């Protein structure tokens, strides 16, 4: 396979992932019309976990974690990355638009290095990193207070920000633990455990049960879209891209997702997004760019070379004038 073909396939997978995860917020909005948030999230990961578990079996993966360390990883991940994260996400999205929800959640890649700095001895956060975290927080505050809202939208933004915190903290904690189970079985068990916890939390929060849900073809379609495509298939695409293009470039999908979410919410749900929300997104994106400036530099340079913005300078190339100046004098 040629490099060009591989690049085009990677771009197609990246775009597919951005579209799936971006439109997931629209599907959540549809489901929340009739489903309580924790129960909705539980049903999503009942199905997603089962699909991914079957995929792991067909792919000849080890079907379950082995030993205490691997089960601890599954327990922490299921609690923080699935249970807490999606309970907060679905609850928060009741109060805000799809675009706002996606933008607030895009603070996760900014918060993750902050937790890593405090919990992982090899991680360091310099002054630029702290400024990046600050910009991300400023962006979140701008969005929370946009349109003069200090009621429902503020509550929604706070819940969504806590969802981002849960994801970032859980990611670092899982990385810190010694267990290293196979990826697909680990994720499927995390999803199933998280779904079980959400089923427990739902009645504790006073949510009505399944018998009260006014099911419709649209709601069923939204649930299956979220579970099968956004969660199970999206997870597989994510790890394929992670292996092919690396962590920095795949993290950029976090900033394509809010654009897709805002556009899909506007096109299909009639949602509007104000200038203050756009400004908040710019703050968050700037914070991420500042934190990852060194890692992003080779990617940006390569992108500029591929698009012809800058010319590729090969080792040994010299400016003609400098070559003339440095040439030895005639004897």
Write out the residue ranges for each language-model feature.
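Helix-helix packing/entry segments at the starts of transmembrane helices
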Residues: 43, 101-107, 172-196, 227-267
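Transmembrane alpha-helices of multi-pass small-molecule transport proteins
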Residues: 32-84, 109-115, 166-170, 187-207, ...
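Specific transmembrane alpha-helical segments of multi-pass solute transporters/efflux pumps
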Residues: 20, 24-25, 53-105, 111, ...
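Hydrophobic residues within alpha-helical transmembrane segments
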Residues: 12, 16, 42-50, 72, ...
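Helix-capping/transition residues at the boundaries of transmembrane alpha-helices
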Residues: 32-33, 93-95, 120, 178, ...
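Membrane-interface interhelical linkers
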Residues: 1-16, 50-76, 122-130, 148-154, ...
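Specific alpha-helical transmembrane segments that line the substrate/conduction pathway
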Residues: 39-49, 81, 89-123, 133, ...
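Hydrophobic transmembrane alpha-helices of multi-pass small-molecule transport proteins
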Residues: 107-109, 115, 125-147, 264, ...
């Amino acid at each position: 396979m040629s490099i060009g073909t591989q690049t085009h396939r990677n771009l197609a997978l990246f775009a597919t992932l951005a579209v799936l995860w971006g439109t997931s917020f629209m599907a959540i909005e549809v489901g929340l019309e009739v489903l309580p948030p924790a129960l909705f999230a539980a049903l999503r990961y009942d199905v997603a976990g089962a699909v991914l578990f079957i995929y792991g079996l067909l792919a000849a993966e080890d079907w379950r974690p082995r030993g205490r360390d691997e089960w601890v990883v599954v327990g922490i991940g299921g609690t923080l990355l699935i249970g807490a994260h999606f309970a907060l996400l679905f609850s928060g999205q009741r109060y805000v638009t799809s675009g706002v929800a996606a933008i607030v959640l895009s603070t996760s890649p900014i918060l993750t290095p902050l937790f890593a700095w405090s919990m992982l001895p090899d991680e360091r956060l310099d002054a630029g990193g702290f400024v990046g975290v600050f910009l991300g927080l400023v962006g979140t505050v701008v969005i929370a207070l946009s349109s003069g809202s200090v009621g429902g939208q503020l509550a929604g933004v706070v819940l969504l920000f806590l969802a981002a915190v849960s994801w970032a903290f859980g990611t670092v904690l899982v990385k810190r633990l010694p267990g290293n189970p196979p990826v697909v079985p680990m994720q499927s068990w995390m999803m199933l455990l998280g779904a079980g916890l959400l089923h427990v939390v739902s009645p504790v929060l006073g949510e009505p049960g399944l018998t009260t849900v006014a099911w419709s073809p649209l709601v069923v379609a939204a649930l299956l879209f979220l579970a099968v495509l956004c969660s199970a298939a999206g997870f597989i695409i994510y790890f394929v891209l992670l292996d092919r293009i690396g962590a920095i470039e795949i993290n950029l999908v976090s900033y394509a997702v809010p654009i897709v979410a805002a556009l899909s919410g506007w096109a299909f749900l009639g949602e509007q997004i104000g200038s203050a929300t756009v400004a908040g997104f710019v703050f968050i994106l700037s914070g991420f760019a500042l934190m990852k400036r060194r890692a992003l530099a080779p990617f940006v340079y390569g992108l500029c070379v591929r698009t012809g913005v800058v010319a590729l300078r090969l080792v040994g190339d010299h400016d003609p004038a400098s070559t003339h100046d440095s040439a030895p004098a005639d004897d």
